[in-house]
Amino acid sequence: MTTNTIAQIQASIKSIPDYPKPGILFRDVTSLLEDAQAYQATIQLLVDKYKDMGFTKVVGTEARGFLFGAPLALQLGVGFVPVRKPGKLPRNTIAQSYELEYGVDTLEIHTDAIVEGDKVLVVDDLLATGGTIEATTKLIRQLGGVVEHAAFVINLPEIGGDKRLEGLGLNVYSICEFEGH
């Protein structure tokens, strides 16, 4: 993919000031989804990057990680595993809590979704603090999966999530970077 393709993807992401609260510049990935060419280019970029790496599963985090992880898994010919908030998955699950700016949240994964030795790619729309992906990585590893890569459409490097995830041994890839919070 060319620099023009990445520029097209980045340009398709709208920035919404003071959402969800004053002082935040929200990066709205749903505007990318509305642009079929940008959405397709995003998935193709991820396919091109990860197609020969031997992944057996793609894990996407609730909810926007599903929008990029599921089509990527299909293109890679591997299964897709959702990581969700508590009470949303019907089979047996394990849970991992993580800290938010003002509180704690929890994620769950089906206990039979990852088998020992699965090589897993984690996908989400945006990397900020890295808390969601840290919790997701812990869940995958608890089930015996091998996770060394995390892919994002957007990274906000000033927040430091990429460094946090690298500290967990993850190779972090993002298509676009934006300044700010």
Swiss-Prot record:
Identify the NCBIfam families for this entry.
Answer: apt, PRK02304.1-1, PRK02304.1-3, PRK02304.1-5
| Biological role | Catalyzes a salvage reaction resulting in the formation of AMP, that is energically less costly than de novo synthesis.
Q: How does it assemble?
A: Homodimer.
Kind of enzyme, top EC level?
A: transferase
- Could you tell me the gene encoding this protein? apt
Catalytic activities? AMP + diphosphate = 5-phospho-alpha-D-ribose 1-diphosphate + adenine
Entry keyword set: Cytoplasm, Glycosyltransferase, Purine salvage, Transferase
GO MF term (any one): adenine binding
The identity of this protein, by name, is: Adenine phosphoribosyltransferase
- Cellular component aspect of the GO annotation: cytoplasm
Recorded hits in Pfam families, A to Z, give: Pribosyltran
Q: Which GO terms describe its biological process?
A: adenine salvage; AMP salvage; purine ribonucleoside salvage
Entry annotated with the keyword Glycosyltransferase = yes
Pathway in which this enzyme or protein is active:
Purine metabolism; AMP biosynthesis via salvage pathway; AMP from adenine: step 1/1
